[in-house]
Regions:
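Single-pass alpha-helical transmembrane signal-anchor segments
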Residues: 12-26
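Aromatic-capped interface at the extracytoplasmic side
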Residues: 23-36
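Soluble catalytic domains of enzymes that build or remodel membrane lipids, polysaccharides, and related
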Residues: 44-257
Length: 257
């Protein structure tokens, strides 16, 4: 076999692998997996022992094509009977209108301590032209905030709330998108979210981009006990089999999924 023929076949195989992986990721977007992680903290108040959190992220509703399958995913979340549900951004790909068909699905999410959310880089509408159908970029963002509220989700915008259980209190912080990568928006304000939270013995942070943790949270806010992020799903492109896990996003982000 000649060198040129070999390289042609090699290129074809590589392209086929890439396309196959993308197709697999797209076709399996409703193949939900629940990953269970147990954490232990000495400073978590006794009243919160056994606290169960369901963490979801990167819904990207504009990519959905099967409402019934989406509803099944919500059912799986509800079946977990969590104390608290946290969503860490990217509700849409670009526009709030993507959520119109799915609001009556996601508004079913509920938990005793509430459903809280933050914004991700896609939620700001930075990747499409505006105005669109007479709607400006600013109006789109405001309508997206309203969608969170209408679904019963408390959107945290550089602020914190206090969670109370059995007379004990912990702080839940949520910030807007903050990335250590220059190409992504940096609207998050940890100083605002953390202000007044010092007195609580345990703090959970919701921040869409995990690069925020190494760059700012770990060095400047060491009293944050748990940070939950999304973002690094790499367009669902990757391979995960027993004993092996790979995605191109791992070469960009230290923390990835």
């Amino acid at each position: 076999i000649s060198r040129s023929t070999f390289l042609s076949w090699l290129g074809l195989a590589a392209g086929g692998t890439l396309f196959g992986s993308l197709l697999y990721g797209y076709s399996n977007k409703y193949n939900y997996h629940v990953k269970r992680i147990q954490l232990a903290y000495d400073n978590l108040p006794a009243a919160f022992k056994g606290l169960k959190i369901v963490h979801i992220s990167d819904i990207h509703s504009g990519s959905f094509t099967d409402k019934k399958a989406v509803a099944h995913g919500v059912e799986k979340i509800l079946n977990e009977k969590a104390d608290l549900i946290l969503f860490t951004g990217d509700l849409v790909n670009d526009r709030t209108s993507e959520m119109e068909e799915y609001m009556d699905v996601f508004n079913k999410l509920n938990a005793p301590l509430g459903v809280y959310s933050t914004l991700g880089n896609h939620d700001y509408g930075d990747y499409v032209r505006w105005p669109y159908n007479g709607i400006t970029k600013e109006q789109n963002l405001e309508s997206l905030k309203k969608v969170h509220a209408d679904m019963g989700w408390k959107l945290l915008m550089n602020e914190h709330v206090v969670l109370e259980k059995g007379g004990a209190e912990i702080a839940l912080l949520g910030i807007e998108n903050w990335s250590n990568k220059a190409r992504f928006p940096k609207h998050g304000r940890m100083d605002l979210a953390h202000a007044g939270a010092d007195k609580y013995p345990f703090k959970i942070l919701m921040s869409h981009d995990p690069s925020h943790w190494d760059a700012q949270v770990k060095p400047n806010y060491p009293d944050v006990d748990l940070t939950l992020s999304g973002h690094t799903h790499g367009m669902q492109f990757g391979i995960e089999i027993p004993g092996f896990k790979w995605s191109p996003v791992q070469y960009i982000y230290k923390q990835w999924a």
